[in-house]
């Protein structure tokens, strides 16, 4: 397959789209093609590979072992092609084109506002924003899937990072919570803790705090988003550890309160992260400079 790659770049893009969506129809919609056209291209790729790349299990489309292996190579090639385009743009001093940014879910509360300001100054930029949990973002960094990332706890490698702004983590409760005095984690052992899914940065931090303090919560409820957790806390379902950046409005109008817990807030930081060795186009370099400048004014 690799020796045919220069003649079949579009086929690789189609294969990548189907692998991401695990759906021919959704991939076709993204690419602006018909579903039969996408299916035909996949059949041609399978003929070149000499192995089936997808298998249908009932109504679910899955990658075969061959498909999974090929996908890694295809994404490496597509990333290299993208980097080559950016290198050529850099030589031309181009400050437009596509810019793909990934942010952890907690950062979605402030990242769109910053990106809106940036794109106003760079109207030629086609901006793509991907929101995911920490574990998924780490996978994207490893795969060189996007240009840059914003996250709270960056990997040690293979990435370079720059500190952006403070990200204090606090314990919050509904406004009618009875106890607000100085608390220890043992005082909270009778509470219901609302937590994100495994792989989330806040979930990892909360579990570490519980382990460090030897606390076994009375009850834990898992939820898939910070927004759902905030609504549940305001409804009195329990308490949660969240980034203060995610709830400025709720705190200002008194819907949530910060509990006075010993050892909190935990002072963390936001970082902009770039995969080590990645060539940044001028527009990406401009974005990094903008984010650093914006952080200094926060």
UniProtKB/Swiss-Prot annotation:
Q: Which InterPro entries match?
A: LysR_subst-bd, Tscrpt_reg_HTH_LysR, WH-like_DNA-bd_sf, WH_DNA-bd_sf
Transmembrane regions listed in the UniProt entry: none
Keyword check for Zinc, yes or no.
no
Q: Which sections of the sequence are annotated for DNA binding?
A: 24-43
**Disulfide bridge positions per record:** none
Instruction: Tell me which UniProt keywords the record has, alphabetically.
Output: Activator, DNA-binding, Transcription, Transcription regulation
Q: Name one Pfam family in it.
A: LysR_substrate
Give every HTH lysR-type domain span: 7-64
Tell me the protein family, please: Belongs to the LysR transcriptional regulatory family.
Role, per record: Transcriptional activator for the cbb operon for RuBisCO and other Calvin cycle genes.
The identity of this protein, by name, is HTH-type transcriptional regulator CbbR
């Amino acid at each position: 397959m690799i020796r045919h790659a220069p003649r079949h770049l579009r086929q690789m893009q189609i294969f990548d789209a189907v692998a991401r969506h695990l759906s021919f129809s959704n991939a076709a919609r993204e690419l602006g093609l018909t579903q039969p056209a996408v299916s035909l291209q996949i059949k041609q790729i399978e003929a070149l590979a000499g192995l089936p790349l997808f298998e249908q299990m009932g109504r679910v489309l899955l990658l075969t072992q061959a498909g999974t292996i090929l996908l890694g190579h295809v994404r490496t090639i597509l990333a290299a092609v993208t980097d080559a385009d950016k290198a050529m743009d850099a030589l031309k001093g181009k400050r437009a084109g596509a810019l793909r940014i990934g942010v952890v879910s907690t950062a979605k509360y402030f990242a769109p506002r910053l990106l809106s300001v940036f794109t106003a100054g760079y109207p030629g930029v086609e901006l793509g924003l991907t929101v995911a949990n920490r574990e998924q973002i780490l996978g994207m960094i490893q795969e060189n899937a996007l240009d840059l990332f914003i996250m709270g706890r960056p990997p040690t490698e293979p990435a370079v990072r720059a500190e952006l702004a403070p990200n204090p983590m606090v314990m919050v409760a509904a406004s009618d919570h009875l106890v607000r005095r100085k608390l220890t984690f043992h005082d909270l052992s009778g509470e219901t803790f609302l937590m994100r899914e495994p792989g989330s940065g806040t979930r990892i931090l909360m579990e570490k705090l519980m382990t460090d303090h030897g606390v076994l919560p009375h009850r834990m409820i898992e939820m898939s988003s910070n927004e759902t957790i905030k609504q549940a806390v305001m409804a009195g379902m329990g308490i949660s550890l969240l980034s203060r950046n995610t709830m400025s409005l709720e705190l200002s109008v008194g819907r949530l309160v910060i509990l006075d817990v010993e050892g909190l807030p935990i002072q963390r930081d936001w970082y902009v992260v770039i995969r080590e060795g990645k060539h940044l186009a001028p527009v990406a370099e401009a974005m990094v400079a903008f984010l650093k400048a914006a952080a200094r004014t926060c």
